[in-house]
Regions:
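Juxtamembrane membrane-water interface segments that cap and precede transmembrane helices
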Residues: 1-2, 130-148
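Interfacial "cap-and-anchor" motif at the non-cytosolic start of specific transmembrane alpha-helices
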Residues: 2-4, 167-238
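Individual alpha-helical transmembrane segments in multi-pass integral membrane proteins
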Residues: 3-21, 33-122, 148-155, 205-211
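Alpha-helical transmembrane segments of multi-pass integral membrane proteins
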Residues: 27-53, 71, 102-107, 143-199
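Membrane-helix interface motif
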Residues: 118-133
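Transmembrane alpha-helical segments
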Residues: 81-85, 162, 218
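Sensory modules in modular signal-transduction proteins
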Residues: 229-262
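PAS/PAS-like sensory domain cap-loop motif
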Residues: 262-269
Length: 269
């Protein structure tokens, strides 16, 4: 296998696997009974267009194909930021008093997407140019004024989301703090990785791997995660060995912990 096929198809294959994984997570979240399922469904779907766009960019053999990939990528990032904002509002409900951002912020995202889509006519947002990377021709971004606006909008809204998630993490009870803090750290890592890609002007956006991982983490912690180990440590010295049966339920009615007496009572010990 020559260098062209090895580097391009390896990353394209990784991106395709991430897309399929995110699609599975999204569909499973939509079928789940939790209210968060809908928010997770849309967020995981939103991660797919940027990854798809970068897969197209990586394998592009001509400028037109690379341009198509870039448009999918940039408009997809607006979709990601919007759904990340909506997910944060749903996920952090109860630990925050206000919305993540005022309602008019979503119109900024619409305006940004529109100004990107008219770039073929105006040429104000970005262009691409070829470069040689590992002895192969790739296409890299040449940012213009519209691209600067795009980055200001997306990074600005992401900062609001990150601050809101940070506040929710601080306010969360010790039992559930882990489910907030891990996603918060993952968001920080992904944003730093994306920033490095922009600064380095690399022809391959490896931060898309982080986007895929973040989507899986969101699915797991929003839908399936239960703080069993911490609950067991906190409650073992209080009611684990008591004679009375003790059940611990979430606000949505899901049993997450029982002591020995309760286990014997329901036949699960």
């Amino acid at each position: 296998m020559n260098t062209y096929y090895s580097i391009r198809f390896i990353y394209a294959g990784i991106f395709v696997l991430l897309i399929l994984t995110l699609l599975m997570c999204a569909l499973n979240a939509k079928r789940h009974y939790k209210a968060l399922g809908q928010a997770v469904f849309w967020l995981d779907l939103a991660f797919i267009p940027p990854i798809l766009g970068n897969a197209i960019i990586v394998v592009a053999r001509n400028k037109m194909m690379a341009l198509v990939g870039n448009y999918i990528y940039f408009v997809g990032m607006d979709f990601v930021v919007y759904e990340l904002m909506k997910f944060t509002e749903a996920y952090c409900k109860g630990n925050r008093r206000e919305r993540i951002a005022p309602a008019w912020v979503q119109y900024l995202l619409v305006a940004d997407s529109l100004q990107l889509l008219i770039n073929p006519i105006t040429g104000h947002a970005f262009d691409i140019e070829w470069t040689v990377y590992q002895n192969q021709v790739f296409y890299v971004l040449k940012p213009l004024a519209g691209q600067a606006f795009h980055r200001i909008v997306d990074y600005g809204i992401f900062l609001l989301v990150f601050i809101g998630f940070s506040v929710a993490t601080i306010r969360a009870s010790r039992i559930y703090r882990e489910r907030y803090s891990i996603i918060l750290v993952a968001m920080g890592i992904v944003s730093a990785w994306e920033t490095y890609y922009i600064i380095s002007n690399s022809p391959i956006d490896r931060s898309m791997i982080g986007f895929g991982v973040l989507g899986v983490l969101v699915y797991y912690f929003a839908i399936h995660y239960r703080p069993l180990k911490l609950l067991d440590r906190m409650l073992s010295g209080i009611v684990s060995n008591g004679k009375d049966a003790c059940f611990i339920f979430t606000p949505r009615g899901r049993c997450v912990w029982v002591n020995n007496a309760a286990g014997i009572l329901v036949g699960v010990s």
